[in-house]
Amino acid sequence: MECDRISTLPDHLVAKIVSYLGIKDSIKTSVLSKRWEFVWLKVVGLDLKNCDFPPNGIASQMVVNKYMEFNSGLHMQYFKVNFGGNTVCTNRFLEWIATAVDRGVQHLDAENKNPVIIKEFMPKKIYKSKTLVSLKLAIKIFLKARHFISVFIVLQGQSIVQFSSRCGTFS
């Protein structure tokens, strides 16, 4: 006779186990039982590509929105989102980045190949983060002045310190 040992584990440990699954499989665990319904939302980070939920990225945006809304008090270890071409442009992309920084994200990796119309380049909170260890941004943006800019930034560990110490805006 088989024994169900996973059901006896505490929620935080079950969430840790689920965090090793891909996002699609993590979400699938929500139908296992009432206890598992929100486990995928309790993982310490989000790693999502819009190709996980084709065809147009709307489902991907819904997953990110649900995760951000459910975990308002959670400290995030990582936030990785990738919206490729052919997806519906989201106006919440930069808001998600700011929210992740607010939650003490350590590893931020955000890519959006769809142009985003913005007033400012990046949320100012990103420059003041005390927890950010690695930063990778690849975002196409339209500034209000109607100039098109494509940005790709990759900073890790000491590079962030060097980058921020050499820029007066960050001091």
From Swiss-Prot:
Ranges of residues in domain F-box: 3-49
Superkingdom classification of source: Eukaryota
SUPFAM superfamilies according to UniProt: F-box domain
Pfam families hit by this protein: F-box (PF00646)
Cross-referenced InterPro entries: F-box-like_dom_sf, F-box_AtFBL13-like, F-box_dom, FBL60-like
Gene3D superfamilies membership: 1.20.1280.50
Alphabetical list of PANTHER family matching this protein: RNI-LIKE SUPERFAMILY PROTEIN
Protein name: Putative F-box protein At1g32020
Source species: Arabidopsis thaliana (Mouse-ear cress)
Lineage, highest ranks first: Eukaryota, Viridiplantae, Streptophyta, Embryophyta, Tracheophyta
